[in-house]
Amino acid sequence: MTKTIKVKKSALIDIIKYPILTDKTTQMIEENKYSFAVEVKAKKPKIKEAIEQLFDVKVQQINTLIVKPQKKRVGKYIGYKSKYKKAVIKLYDPYKINLFADN
C-alpha cells in the first residue's frame, strides 16, 4: 500500500531540470523512453510523481544514474563541470511527451 501525497507543482518543477537531447536519446524516443536531468538528491518515486503530474502521462519504468563530473580546461586552468543525475523514463504505450515545439 503506497501513499501518494499531493505536492505543489512548483516543488515538482524543481525536481526536473531539463530534458537531455542527444543523438542517442532521440533514438530512444522512438522506443517511448525519455531522458531528463533531475535533482541529484531526487529519488525514483518523486521523479515518477513529478513526470506524471507535469506531463500528464503514466510511467512504466525509471532508471537513474549519476553522471560524474567532467574535466573542463580553460587555458592553463583545469576545472570541472558539475555532476548531475540522469533519469531515463519509459512510458506506457499510448502516452507521449512532446519535447519539440510545433510551429
From Swiss-Prot:
Molecular function per GO: rRNA binding; structural constituent of ribosome
Q: Which GO terms describe its cellular component?
A: chloroplast; ribonucleoprotein complex; ribosome
Task: Give the GO terms filed under biological process for this record.
Answer: translation
Point out the coiled-coil segments of this chain: none
Q: What domain of life does the native source organism fall in?
A: Eukaryota
Q: Give the keywords, sorted.
A: Chloroplast, Plastid, Ribonucleoprotein, Ribosomal protein, RNA-binding, rRNA-binding
One Pfam family per UniProt: Ribosomal_L23
Has keyword Ribosomal protein?
A: yes
Cellular localisation = Plastid, Chloroplast
- Using the UniProt record, give the first listed, main subcellular location: plastid
Keyword Transmembrane recorded:
no
Instruction: State the protein's purpose.
Output: Binds to 23S rRNA.
Partners and quaternary state? Part of the 50S ribosomal subunit.
The cross-references to PANTHER family, in alphabetical order and at most eight, read: 60S RIBOSOMAL PROTEIN L23A (PTHR11620)
Q: Which family does it belong to?
A: Belongs to the universal ribosomal protein uL23 family.
Q: This chain belongs to which protein, by name?
A: Large ribosomal subunit protein uL23c
Q: Which organism does this sequence originate in?
A: Gracilaria tenuistipitata var. liui
